C-alpha cells in the first residue's frame, strides 16, 4: 500500500529496501502480513518503479506492458479524472501482483476515497479550496510519472485509447446520471434508516469535520452539482481526456516544473512549507 508520498509517484527510487521491514519509503506491506511472512519481497515493486524511472524511451515503449496491467491503469486514470481524488495520485493506492511465479506484472486497487467529488480530506478553510473545484486540473499526468510517460510517449496510442475508453465508460459505470442516482440511493438508505439524522446529530460542528455542520441533503446537492460541472469540464477544450493535443512536449531529462504540497496538491513556487517538485521533497520556511 502506498501510504505516503515518499517515492510513490515514481519520479525517483533507491534500491535501499529491507525485506525484513514492514515499510519501504512510502510503501507498506499489507498482504501477506509481515508477521505471517517474513521476509517479504519488495523486489517486484522496486523493479517496476526503477523501470519507470530509468528506462529509455524505446525500452519503456517495448516493455511497459510486462511490468503493469495497462487496461487497469487506464481505467484508474479515467476514474481519477472523473471523481478527482486529490489524495490518490500515487498515494492511497494498493499495488499487487497477480502471480509472481508467472509474471511480475503489477495491478492496482483503489483505497481511501474521502477526498473525492469536490471534498478535501482535512476540512480546512476554505472548506472547498480551488484544487477540489470541478473545473480545475487533477494533474494525473504531472503527478505520477508512469502516467506521464504513457501519455508523453503515447504508448500504443494510449491517448486515443484513453479517450475511447472514457466515452465507453461514460455510457455505463461513469455515466453522470448513474453516478448521481447512486449517491441518491445511498442517501435514501441513510435517511430512511435514521442513520443520517443520527450522524448529523453526532458529528455536526465536530473538530473532525472542521467544526462545520453535517447535512447529508446539502452534501447530496453539492455532489450532484459538482458532478454536473465536472462532466462539462471533461468535455471542454481544457479537458485532460478529450483533446486533439496528443503529444505532451517535454524533454524527459528536464524536471517537471509543477510544485505540489505533501497532499499532492498543486501550489505556487513561493508556497511555504514542505513541497514536492519532480518527486523530490524540499522544505521551505519563512526567514
Give, region by region, the residue ranges found by the protein language model.
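Short strand-coil-strand connectors
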Residues: 111, 263, 277-280
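Conserved ATP-binding subdomain of kinase catalytic cores across diverse folds
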Residues: 1-26
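Middle-to-C-terminal accessory/interaction subdomains
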Residues: 39-90, 96-98, 102-243
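Residue-level detector of functionally pivotal "anchor" positions at catalytic/ligand-binding pockets or at interdomain
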Residues: 239-263
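C-terminal tail/sorting-segment detector
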Residues: 274-287
